[in-house]
């Protein structure tokens, strides 16, 4: 069950178990992307940083959307995890993972060693300055929806593949394959 956190002025919903002393785990869906350096190694690093992986999609290669025109192609995947972290603690973990890959935040939609985004967090809707769940741009991003549809098609909007502008997206492989 999720309850509204009235201690803040933002709309945050927290998962609570019937026994409030019990630490619960929740599932979350994470998107990963990389377009600088050894892209596969950065994706592996991020995947390895999550202890309890439930599902991992295939990896897709796409051209960048927005930002500088001279960027290299991205590798993208989506994974679902089980976590005992609350959504904001999970966000901090995602940012630490990006930092561990030497992520630099210099240009909006610019090239990056690693991008780690929380798409969904089980049973929670959050809208704050720091975090919005579900991710606000998910329905506009074929590079997220294609891998998401592999592991959680129920989370994709109806007819998304027909309504989004087609962009080139190529199946690249899986996280277990060597490239």
Regions found by a protein language model. Give the residues of each.
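Conserved small/polar residues in nucleotide/adenosyl-binding loops
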Residues: 1-6
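Compositionally biased regions
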Residues: 7-10, 18-21, 175, 179
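N-terminal beta1-alpha1 ligand-phosphate binding loop
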Residues: 12-51, 56-64
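Flexible, gly/pro- and Lys/Arg-enriched active-site loops
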Residues: 13, 57-75, 88-179
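Short beta-strand-to-loop capping motifs
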Residues: 34, 79-83, 120-123
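Hydrophobic alpha-helical segments and helix-packing faces
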Residues: 36-39, 43, 68, 72, ...
